[in-house]
């Protein structure tokens, strides 16, 4: 790393006031920002001093994010709804971001902090590559994001939680077919590389993950992974009011990004819309209410 005093490790030095100071890691944009303009960090947008509380309804929250690995790559997708308490705060929120050529993030939780997390992380990766002349390894990218999440712990204890889901393609993996990576984080900055092949975060994650568990055997390429992701988000929206499903009336659909050996690429909205219509049509043909409910409908003459 590039330290201000050109040493391998930061050593305390005396500043002009005679007080020991620690050199700044210039390759880390977030650390540089914390020294030069700390008020711009997402964590410092929250006023401290209050007692810890649960997740707050005072600001919009975004959910749900899903990710799946497929042979030769990985896919991440997210719904578009944000909620504020029991109200819908937004219907077309962008929750999935490409952060560099081979990584993308989707963040659930407090919307304002989550969006700034994603943007700051993208700048962090670009800043490192410009200063060092080489991109971070995938493990290095994970550690950088973990440090940023850990820095938000104080706000998280006040209810302003923002949890990312990181996906990427590991260029150092000797087996390209299995180079897709999914990494989940907790509020304290702990992280875990998912080995099952799929993961989800957000209020609808339990429903989305259950759906992916049943459908994951159908994943054979990027397109089949996208279909499973749309199915999972549809299932999450069916049971979680904070998750928005495909909105055919307004033309609002989930967003998705695929990452393979060629790099990260946003999935065209037209393809997602096509799959969403297929899922809705398939679900509409299926009797999901049981024979008793069907007999009741027929008796009323509603069929």
Curated annotation (Swiss-Prot):
Entry annotation: catalytic residues: 63 (nucleophile)
GO molecular function: threonine-type endopeptidase activity
Pathway this chain belongs to: Protein degradation; proteasomal Pup-dependent pathway
Positions of the UniProt region annotated as Disordered: 282-303
Any Gene Ontology biological process: proteasomal protein catabolic process
InterPro entries given in the database record: Ntn_hydrolases_N (IPR029055), Proteasome_sua/b (IPR001353), Proteasome_suB-type (IPR023333), PSB_actinobac (IPR022483)
Regulation: The formation of the proteasomal ATPase ARC-20S proteasome complex, likely via the docking of the C-termini of ARC into the intersubunit pockets in the alpha-rings, may trigger opening of the gate for substrate entry. Interconversion between the open-gate and close-gate conformations leads to a dynamic regulation of the 20S proteasome proteolysis activity. PPS auto-regulates its own activity via pupylation and degradation of its components. Peptidolytic activity is inhibited by N-acetyl-Leu-Leu-norleucinal (Ac-LLnL) in vitro.
Residues cleaved off as propeptide: 1-62
Family stated for the protein in its record: Belongs to the peptidase T1B family.
Record note on quaternary structure: The 20S proteasome core is composed of 14 alpha and 14 beta subunits that assemble into four stacked heptameric rings, resulting in a barrel-shaped structure. The two inner rings, each composed of seven catalytic beta subunits, are sandwiched by two outer rings, each composed of seven alpha subunits. The catalytic chamber with the active sites is on the inside of the barrel. Has a gated structure, the ends of the cylinder being occluded by the N-termini of the alpha-subunits. Is capped by the proteasome-associated ATPase, ARC.
NCBIfam families linked to this entry: 20S_bact_beta
Protein name: Proteasome subunit beta
Protein's organism: Mycolicibacterium smegmatis (strain ATCC 700084 / mc(2)155) (Mycobacterium smegmatis)
């Amino acid at each position: 790393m590039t330290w201000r005093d050109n040493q391998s490790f930061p050593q305390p030095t005396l500043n002009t006031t005679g007080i020991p100071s620690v050199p700044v890691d210039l390759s880390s944009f977030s650390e540089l920002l914390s020294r030069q303009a700390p008020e711009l960090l997402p964590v410092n947008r929250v006023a401290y001093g209050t007692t810890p509380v649960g997740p707050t309804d005072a600001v919009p929250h975004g959910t749900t994010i899903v990710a799946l690995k497929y042979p030769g790559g990985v896919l991440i997708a997210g719904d578009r709804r944000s909620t504020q308490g029991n109200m819908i705060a937004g219907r077309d929120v962008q929750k999935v971001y490409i952060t560099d050529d081979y990584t993308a993030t989707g963040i659930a939780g407090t919307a304002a902090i989550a969006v700034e997390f994603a943007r700051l992380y993208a700048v962090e990766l670009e800043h490192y590559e410009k200063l060092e002349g080489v991109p971070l390894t995938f493990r290095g990218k994970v550690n950088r994001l973990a440090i940023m999440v850990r820095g938000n712990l104080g706000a998280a204890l006040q209810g302003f939680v923002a949890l990312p889901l990181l996906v990427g393609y590991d260029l150092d993996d000797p087996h390209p077919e299995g180079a897709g990576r999914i990494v989940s984080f907790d509020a304290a900055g702990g992280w875990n590389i998912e080995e099952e092949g799929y993961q989800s975060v957000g209020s609808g994650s339990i429903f989305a993950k259950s759906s992916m568990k049943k459908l994951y055997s159908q994943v054979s390429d990027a397109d089949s992974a996208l279909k499973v992701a749309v199915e999972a988000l549809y299932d999450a929206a069916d049971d979680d009011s904070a998750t928005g499903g495909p909105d055919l009336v307004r033309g609002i659909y989930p967003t998705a990004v695929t990452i393979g050996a060629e790099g990260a690429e946003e999935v065209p909205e037209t393809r997602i819309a096509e799959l969403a219509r297929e899922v809705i049509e398939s679900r509409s043909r299926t009797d999901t209410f049981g024979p008793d409910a069907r007999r009741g409908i027929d008796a009323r003459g509603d069929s």
